[in-house]
Amino acid sequence: MTPASEPLQFTVQPVYWTATQLVLRAIRAKVFVEEQGVPPDLEWDGLDEHAYHVIAYALDGTPIGTGRLLQDGHIGRLAVIMEWRGRGVGRSILDMLLVIANKMGYDMVKLHAQTRVLEFYRRRGFERQGKEFMEAGISHVAMTRSTADQTVWPAAFPGGNVARG
């Protein structure tokens, strides 16, 4: 994790699917399809065009992570390139999605967390809902969280507009 005294080495920003889908697809293909073995037909579910998306960029402009918020308040497809994990990128992406959810009027968000990263989501205020289940061949747990306290843009966000689709 980056100490508070060090400047962030990345930014996170909302993006339009139509303008950035090749970049979003490349990140997700690398993390989910190649690294985790998710079948491509499950990864590309047809919901991206109407979702809110964010991308994390290294300061040199390299895309390093992404996530999305669906119109039903479901957060998903949170992916960080392996070399950037453990440096606050995933946390910043999630925080950005929570602020977007709050600003769009969602009181509560939900997600399906891979069981190996449950603690990451617990630290961000998510609560487990129900038993483990398999999704795309990976063990998951449903989780929910209020967005009421998520009103300030994360430090990694350089602007103020929210993009969708």
Positions of predicted regions on the chain:
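Conserved N-terminal entry element of GNAT/NAT acetyltransferase domains
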Residues: 1-18, 150-165
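Conserved beta-strand in the GNAT
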Residues: 55, 61-79
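Conserved acetyl-CoA pyrophosphate-binding loop and the N-cap/start of the following alpha-helix
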Residues: 84, 88-96
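Active-site rim helix/loop that mediates acceptor-substrate recognition in acyltransferases
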Residues: 29-59
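Conserved GNAT acetyl-CoA-binding A-motif
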Residues: 101-114
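Short beta-strand micro-motifs in enzyme catalytic cores
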Residues: 50-54, 76, 139-143
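Conserved active-site alpha-helix within GNAT-family acetyltransferase domains
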Residues: 115-141
